[in-house]
């Protein structure tokens, strides 16, 4: 298994697909990286030479924010909103939907399981 950006990527898959296992790299960025490095898109990970893996690793380190750095930045952005006390920060703090979705019904994923109300029957 090749290890890129702290992630063991699967060896049997094509390089473009395998790169998407890294947090922060989707299909579009994976194709960009492969094109920059000059590797054929249909090549599998186990067919890559050590030099090609090193080129991919350097391209990702140089041009993209991935894995821990990306997760930390996302968490810091949310924390900043919460510290500001703006509407989005309050919604994050209360564990409610942030982007204007309705909460009267639905929003169960964000709010968690429904709480039983004593004495309420159909």
Swiss-Prot record:
Keywords: Ribonucleoprotein, Ribosomal protein, RNA-binding, rRNA-binding, tRNA-binding. PROSITE patterns: RIBOSOMAL_S13_1, RIBOSOMAL_S13_2. It holds the Pfam family Ribosomal_S13. Residues 99-122 are annotated as: Disordered. GO terms for biological process: translation. Signal peptide: none annotated. The keyword Ribosomal protein applies. GO terms for molecular function: rRNA binding; structural constituent of ribosome; tRNA binding. Located at the top of the head of the 30S subunit, it contacts several helices of the 16S rRNA. In the 70S ribosome it contacts the 23S rRNA (bridge B1a) and protein L5 of the 50S subunit (bridge B1b), connecting the 2 subunits; these bridges are implicated in subunit movement. Contacts the tRNAs in the A and P-sites. Part of the 30S ribosomal subunit. Forms a loose heterodimer with protein S19. Forms two bridges to the 50S subunit in the 70S ribosome. Belongs to the universal ribosomal protein uS13 family. HAMAP family: Ribosomal_uS13. This is Small ribosomal subunit protein uS13. It comes from Rhizobium johnstonii (strain DSM 114642 / LMG 32736 / 3841) (Rhizobium leguminosarum bv. viciae).
């Amino acid at each position: 298994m090749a290890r890129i950006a702290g992630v063991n990527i699967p060896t049997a898959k094509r390089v473009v697909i395998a790169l998407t296992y890294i947090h922060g790299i989707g299909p579009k960025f994976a194709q960009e990286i492969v094109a920059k490095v000059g590797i054929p898109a249909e090549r599998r990970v186990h067919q890559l030479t050590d030099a090609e893996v090193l080129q991919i690793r350097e391209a990702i380190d140089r041009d993209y924010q991935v894995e821990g750095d990306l997760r930390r930045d996302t968490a810091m952005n949310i924390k900043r909103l919460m510290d500001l006390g703006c509407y989005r920060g309050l919604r994050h703090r209360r564990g409610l939907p942030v982007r204007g979705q309705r909460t009267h019904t639905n929003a169960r994923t964000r709010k968690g399981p429904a709480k039983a109300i004593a004495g309420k029957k159909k």
